[in-house]
Amino acid sequence: MHQSLTQQRSSDMSLPDSMGAFNRRKRNSIYVTVTLLIVSVLILTVGLAATTRTQNVTVGGYYPGVILGFGSFLGIIGSNLIENKRQMLVASIVFISFGVIAAFCCAIVDGVFAARHIDLKPLYANRCHYVPKTSQKEAEEVITSSSKITPSTRALRNLTQAVKEVNCPQLSRGLCTPRIRGNTCFCCDLYNCGNRVEITGGYYEYIDVSSCQDIIHLYHLLWSATILNIVGLFLGIITAAVLGGFKDMNPTRPALNCSVENAHPTVSYYARPQVASYNTYYHSPPHLPPYSAYDFQHSGVFPSSPPSGLSDEQEPQSPSPSPSYMWSSSAPPRYSPPYYPPFEKPPPYSP
C-alpha cells in the first residue's frame, strides 16, 4: 500500500516535467522551421533576381528555395497538430531532405559559375560597351537590305562604327566582326576571334541587360545565392533532425490525470476497513455465540443435566452457554464449524 502511494505521487510529479519537455521540443521545432522558411524565401528571391538579370545566363539557385520552403511550411503545420502530427512531420522531413540535396548541388553549380565564367576585370576597367537596341535595328536593316552597295561591305562599315565605341581594334578585320545584339553588354577583351569557345573563361556578352552594371549585380547575386544555399543546407539538416525527434512525442492525455486522482480514494477505501475488521475480529469479544439458529430450534434434544465435573458455583461464572444447549450423543453433528476466538476457554465436550 505504501509502495502504491509512492508510485502515484511520483507519477503526479512527473506529469509537469513531461509536459514541459513536450512544449520545449515543440517550441524548438517551430523556431527552426520558421528560420528555414525565412532562408528559403531569401534563396527563392535572390535566385529569381539572378536568373532574370540577363537572358543568356541561367541560374538554378532558386529551386532549393521552393523545396525547402514547402518542407518548412509542412513542418510548421505538423508541429501544431496533435492527431496527424507524425504524418505531416514525416512529409516535411522528406521534402527538407530533397531540398538539402538540391541546395548542395546548386551551391556548387552557382559558385563554380560565378568564379570561372564571370570576369569583372574588363568591367572595372571600363572596357565593356553597352550596345542599345537602336544599334541592333540599324545593323539588321543594313545586313538584310538590298542595295547597290554589297551587304557585306555596308554591314562591315556600320558594325565597325558600332564596335569602335567598344575600343576593340582587333574587330576591324572582316573575319573577326561579331554580330552584336541590342541591349547587350559586350566585352571585346573576353572574346576570342574566330573561336566559339571562350578559352579565357568568361562570358564576353550579356544579352537583354539595361547596362553593364547589371553584370556586377549578377555576380553579387550569384555569390549571395551560393552562400544562402550553403546556409539552407546546414539549416535543413538541423531542422530534419529536430523534427525527427519531435514526431514521436505525444502530449500527456487528460485521462491519465483522472486515473491518478481516482487512485487515492480507492486505496484509502479498501485499506481502512481491512485494518478495522482485523482488529475487531481478533481483539474484541464476539457479539454472537458460536452457535447457529439451527441449534436453538432443536434445543429439546439436549439434556437438561449439567455436564459432569462442574459445580453449581462455577456455572454462572462460566462463559460457556447454558447446559440446556449442550449436544447429546444422539444429536446430529453441529452446523457451524467449531471455531473459538483466542483467549477464551472452549465449552466442554460430552460424549
UniProtKB/Swiss-Prot annotation:
The listed locations are:
Membrane
Which ranges of the sequence are coiled-coil? none
Look up the record and give one Gene Ontology term from the biological process aspect. Answer: response to bacterium
GO cellular-component term (any): membrane
Q: Where is this region: Disordered?
A: 302-331
Stated membrane topology is: Multi-pass membrane protein
Q: Which InterPro entries match?
A: TMEM255 (IPR028014)
Protein name, as recorded:
Transmembrane protein 255A
What species is this protein from? Rattus norvegicus (Rat)
